[in-house]
């Protein structure tokens, strides 16, 4: 057993444990030393004086672009000079008719007229019938009318709820005796022996012995 005496060789190591959690990131390292100076550059391949390049042929003008968005409204302009006085307007149409005026004073009575001529003598002619008079009082009720014909039978009503079960009826009469059944199959042979011998043998009817 480990921990007792000096017995290190008798104890074997166990299985490796699960991997531990990753450690915290380390501190940033110190800045490195400055590098050595670089090699001198190569001599230029092109000549010192640049060769003039002829200008390119101007390209044809492209198609006009789509119209741009409407710009914001400009600042208000300065007020203009006062205009010249206008001409007189033509007369307007006649206005609507006014309300009627108050009634005038009564005139002076006229002179008396001449007496009228006598009416010619004519026979009496009955005038047109006058308007109908007011409704009279309600009369007494008339006699009863004849009885009407019997109406057609109405539609059958909906099925009512199920009633309670009635009392059980009296037992019925006993039925007639049934027909006699078919004869049964012949019975099996009996198990009793037919006779027994002196030596202990047992003989049956089917010829077997035990």
UniProtKB/Swiss-Prot annotation:
Keywords: Collagen, Cuticle, Repeat
One GO cellular component term noted in the UniProt record for this chain: collagen trimer
Single GO molecular function: structural constituent of cuticle
Keyword Nuclease appears in the UniProt entry: no
Keyword flag Repeat: yes
Sequence ranges of Low complexity compositional bias: 105-122, 167-179
Residue ranges of the region described as Disordered: 11-210
InterPro entries, sorted: Collagen (IPR008160)
Pro residues bias (residue ranges): 40-76, 88-103, 123-144
A Pfam family of this chain: Collagen
Other known facts: This protein shows 4 potential triple-helical regions, which contain glycine as every third amino acid.
Record's function text: Nematode cuticles are composed largely of collagen-like proteins. The cuticle functions both as an exoskeleton and as a barrier to protect the worm from its environment.
Protein family per UniProt: Belongs to the cuticular collagen family.
Record-linked PANTHER family: COLLAGEN, CUTICLE COLLAGEN 34-RELATED
Name listed for the protein in its UniProt record: Cuticle collagen 2C
């Amino acid at each position: 057993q480990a921990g007792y005496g000096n017995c290190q060789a008798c104890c074997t190591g166990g299985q490796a444990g699960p991997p531990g959690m990753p450690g915290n990131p380390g501190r940033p390292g110190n800045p490195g030393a400055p590098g050595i100076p670089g090699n001198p550059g190569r001599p230029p391949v092109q000549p010192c004086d640049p060769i003039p390049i002829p200008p390119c042929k101007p390209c044809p003008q492209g198609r006009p672009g789509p119209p741009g968005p409407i710009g914001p409204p400009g600042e208000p302009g300065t007020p203009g000079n006062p205009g010249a006085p206008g001409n007189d307007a033509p007369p307007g149409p006649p206005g609507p008719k006014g309300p009627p005026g108050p009634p005038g004073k009564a005139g002076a009575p006229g002179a008396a007229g001449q007496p009228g001529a006598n009416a010619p003598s004519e026979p009496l002619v009955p005038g047109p019938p006058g308007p109908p008079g007011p409704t009279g009082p309600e009369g007494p009720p008339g006699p009863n009318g004849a009885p009407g014909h019997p109406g057609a039978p109405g539609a059958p009503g909906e099925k009512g709820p199920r009633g309670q079960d009635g009392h059980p009826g009296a037992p019925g009469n006993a039925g007639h005796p049934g027909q006699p059944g078919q004869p049964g199959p012949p019975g099996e042979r009996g198990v009793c022996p037919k006779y027994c011998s002196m030596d202990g043998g047992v003989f049956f009817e089917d010829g077997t012995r035990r």
